[in-house]
């Protein structure tokens, strides 16, 4: 297990943003994205980190970005620190395995969610309305059922500490333009269906996931992260049983623990027991090993 990285401080690099998990440095023509071991739940960053989480997220993203290059280009220039600008080299011990040098794209103002199974907020929506985000679904579906076809449900990109809001496809057209919105929807569904089939052979069900896209040199590319346990619901195929919630290889384990507490889901976060931190880390690492065949 490597040293926990909760935050980075590189005085001679320009910090552009600090998100819930990632620290982003502006290197001029490019960006340096460092994935820390921070973890958030219900849009609140926990005080404790998850050992090796940044490594797992970076390696899983790189795996999926490579798999999807026949569908869409991505923002990665390199994940090898030796390829990074010289100003980054002195921080190699922190950056190794958890960072990416990426193209500086203009992000689209929407997050692109695809759901192949009915779970989480989608299940609540369906129980109340028979639809998910306004998309009518067949009657009689059970929690965690596979949907007849994957559905595309975009959302707004919320500021740090606030919640994303689901939007209609028509609203996405307003935000991004018709041609871009339609292309994003088509690409998102294609990526998901390819990934679902790959994951299936490795014993993982990808129930739903979230993508971000940007424009680089006039071209649509995929940015941020790609089908990690932070942006997706991963379920073990061998124990899949619709009709209730599923065990998972993602932070659902942490969310489930937090639901047992008398906590109002706003900052400050409650302290996490060592066992919850350890088990969450094990679930993340298990996802990496199952998907790529390699741990750390």
Curated annotation (Swiss-Prot):
<keyword id="KW-0547">Nucleotide-binding</keyword>
<dbReference type="Pfam" id="PF01259">
    <property type="entry name" value="SAICAR_synt"/>
</dbReference>
<protein>
    <recommendedName>
        <fullName>Phosphoribosylaminoimidazole-succinocarboxamide synthase</fullName>
        <ecNumber>6.3.2.6</ecNumber>
    </recommendedName>
</protein>
<dbReference type="InterPro" id="IPR028923">
    <property type="entry name" value="SAICAR_synt/ADE2_N"/>
</dbReference>
<dbReference type="GO" id="GO:0006189">
    <property type="term" value="P:'de novo' IMP biosynthetic process"/>
</dbReference>
<comment type="pathway">
    <text>Purine metabolism; IMP biosynthesis via de novo pathway; 5-amino-1-(5-phospho-D-ribosyl)imidazole-4-carboxamide from 5-amino-1-(5-phospho-D-ribosyl)imidazole-4-carboxylate: step 1/2.</text>
</comment>
<keyword id="KW-0067">ATP-binding</keyword>
<dbReference type="GO" id="GO:0005524">
    <property type="term" value="F:ATP binding"/>
</dbReference>
<dbReference type="InterPro" id="IPR001636">
    <property type="entry name" value="SAICAR_synth"/>
</dbReference>
<dbReference type="GO" id="GO:0005737">
    <property type="term" value="C:cytoplasm"/>
</dbReference>
<dbReference type="GO" id="GO:0004639">
    <property type="term" value="F:phosphoribosylaminoimidazolesuccinocarboxamide synthase activity"/>
</dbReference>
<keyword id="KW-0658">Purine biosynthesis</keyword>
<comment type="similarity">
    <text>Belongs to the SAICAR synthetase family.</text>
</comment>
<keyword id="KW-0436">Ligase</keyword>
